[in-house]
């Protein structure tokens, strides 16, 4: 009986504890990211932002959560009730599942699988289903139009994102995210320089992937009221909101892992190794999240045809050319990894 416990049940308990250890801090980070966004944008616009609830407004996310929790959930009369309720749950759960393969520090990862990149791409592609289901189930033209926009936008930028990731795989020779980070420890500086433009393209693509300004066409307030979540209230609206911000943190972690060295110190400076890798990971993710907020505060929304043109006529040819360029340079210099 004891052998059975240690062989089958104990590993499941450890996995459950790891999931809780990642999920609870992540939800807290998502809650306080909304607070940080309002404060940062407020300061950029010479306003105070939320500063009443608690010291410096730090209890504002808790007040917002309590308010949304006690709101009445309203389901439209002609909506598909089951799908209407399921859609925000799908979006939120998928935004959390992606964290399973992200390495926070050396050896600190929930599932260190050898196909981590494919797993991340699969999860990010599935997240659009929650939005499409919400738009269709709401039985509203605004919600449906927002859902169609979101699916078209995601398809357009998933292609260039995939090609950018191929350039990373060519230089590191692995699909394991922990090994990708470790490969950057010994990577020559000129390869880092060659990947830098792709890092910029990847970051712009994930802005479109997460429906953030200047690519927030699926929920354009001035055109579609609120897009795919126009009919949602209470916790349904809150789950969409949490899912969007959790995705922001996830794609920032992906960008950090692929292009900024993950948990490694900046520029591989050896004397900075004394600082824990988790600190560097959080610092880099925090910087990218600040860029998200900065872009939202300063840039206007793209027109929809401009958004599509950027994805198909600029990013797709550029990333295709860069894949050929990187592979040619690696073969010529004999730096192609032995897989």
Curated annotation (Swiss-Prot):
InterPro entries per the UniProt record, alphabetical: NADH_UbQ_OxRdtase_su1/FPO, NADH_UbQ_OxRdtase_su1_CS
TM region positions: 9-29, 82-102, 115-135, 161-181, 187-207, 235-255, 275-295, 311-331
Alphabetically ordered keywords of this record: Cell inner membrane, Cell membrane, Membrane, NAD, Quinone, Translocase, Transmembrane, Transmembrane helix, Ubiquinone
Bilayer topology term: Multi-pass membrane protein
EC number: 7.1.1.-
Gene Ontology CC terms: plasma membrane
One GO molecular-function entry: NADH dehydrogenase activity
Record-level GO BP terms: aerobic respiration
Compartments, record wording: Cell inner membrane
UniProt catalytic activity: a quinone + NADH + 5 H(+)(in) = a quinol + NAD(+) + 4 H(+)(out)
PROSITE patterns, sorted: COMPLEX1_ND1_1 (PS00667), COMPLEX1_ND1_2 (PS00668)
Subunit structure, interactors included: NDH-1 is composed of 14 different subunits. Subunits NuoA, H, J, K, L, M, N constitute the membrane sector of the complex.
Alphabetized PANTHER family for the sequence: NADH DEHYDROGENASE SUBUNIT 1, NADH-UBIQUINONE OXIDOREDUCTASE CHAIN 1
Functional note: NDH-1 shuttles electrons from NADH, via FMN and iron-sulfur (Fe-S) centers, to quinones in the respiratory chain. The immediate electron acceptor for the enzyme in this species is believed to be ubiquinone. Couples the redox reaction to proton translocation (for every two electrons transferred, four hydrogen ions are translocated across the cytoplasmic membrane), and thus conserves the redox energy in a proton gradient. This subunit may bind ubiquinone.
HAMAP family associated with the record: NDH1_NuoH
Similarity-based family: Belongs to the complex I subunit 1 family.
Name of the protein in question: NADH-quinone oxidoreductase subunit H
Annotated organism of origin: Rickettsia bellii (strain OSU 85-389)
Lineage: Bacteria, Pseudomonadati, Pseudomonadota, Alphaproteobacteria, Rickettsiales
